[in-house]
Amino acid sequence: LGLAKGKIQMKIAIASDLHLEFGDLDIQNTDGADVLLLSGDICVAADLDMRDRRQTEMGFARWRSEMFHGFFERCATNFPHVIYVMGNHEYYHSDFATALGDMRRKLAHLPNLYILEREIKVIDDVTFIGGTLWTDMNNQDDLTMYHMRTMMNDFRVIQHSAVPVNFRTSEGEFKTRVAKFSPEDAVTEHVKMKEYIQVVTDMLGKNPNRYVVVGHHSPSRRSTHAMYANDTIMNGGYSSDLDEFIENRPQIKLWTHGHTHHEFDYVIGETRVVCNPRGYIGHEPQADKWKLKTVEI
């Protein structure tokens, strides 16, 4: 993982699963990082209002929106660049088809904050590839998808207007409703993101740039806490086995993720995999002691 000749080291600060809906956070750039990576589950997008509505009707919902805006504005002030990917919680109580665009509009006044979804951002000689990733549900296992559909909030509280559902009422009338985001949708999104990473790193990989993948769901089973090691089905909603995929792409020097509320830092081939989640402040012990993590590539 040594630095190639002629490369300038870049300092990258890493955070995920800050869950500001449980409590605010002030991130300071004490290490002089060049880039802050926010690997998802930072806030609930439905609770973030447009900037021009911030000064009206300061009830609880408005207060929460003001807190979220304040956090992102401090990050954009304290760090030269902020790269942000949506986690699953960003989509809660929203429409999967429109939430990403809504989030971008609400934060458009911050020119150095980049929300990526199957997109890249090049900073100096580092290409950042961003997207939620989701999972392959244990390689599209039917039992895993059945359990995830009934057990995970993702598939109960996220709408998906791009997928209409036709149904018949008890009176025999045919109607259409908006579908819920489904495990099958998650697999589709996972495949798209994996293919995008493959295209970027394989087709553009001959250039001298280093690559960093910023995701939310884990790309490796190694990001599974020992206490959940035997929960094979449930783990399918948290991680995918992309170890070989990563090993075959040594140009990826760093891969960040969140989703699990346990810290991880390990190496697959030439790639450092880092997860630095805060979790639910006031509900999880590690959240009260959380610190920003800075690495160099």
Briefly describe each language-model feature range.
Residues 129-212, 217-229:
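Active-site-proximal loop/helix segment associated with metal-binding centers of metalloenzymes
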Residues 24-31, 70-76, 115-124, 129, ...:
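Short amphipathic alpha-helices and their capping/turn segments at secondary-structure boundaries
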Residues 122, 225, 230, 234-253, ...:
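Binuclear metal-dependent phosphoesterase catalytic core
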Residues 14-16, 36-41, 83-88, 114-118, ...:
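Active-site neighborhood of phospho(di)ester-bond hydrolases with catalytic His/Asp-centered motifs
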Residues 2-84, 91-98:
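N-terminal active-site segment of His-dependent metallophosphoesterases
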Residues 19-25, 43-47, 89-99, 120-122, ...:
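Active-site environment of divalent metal-dependent phosphoester hydrolases
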Residues 81-152:
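A basic- and aromatic-enriched beta-loop-alpha substructure that forms the phosphate/nucleotide-
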Residues 8-12, 120-130, 210, 267-272:
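Beta-strand-turn-beta hairpins that frame and shape the catalytic cleft
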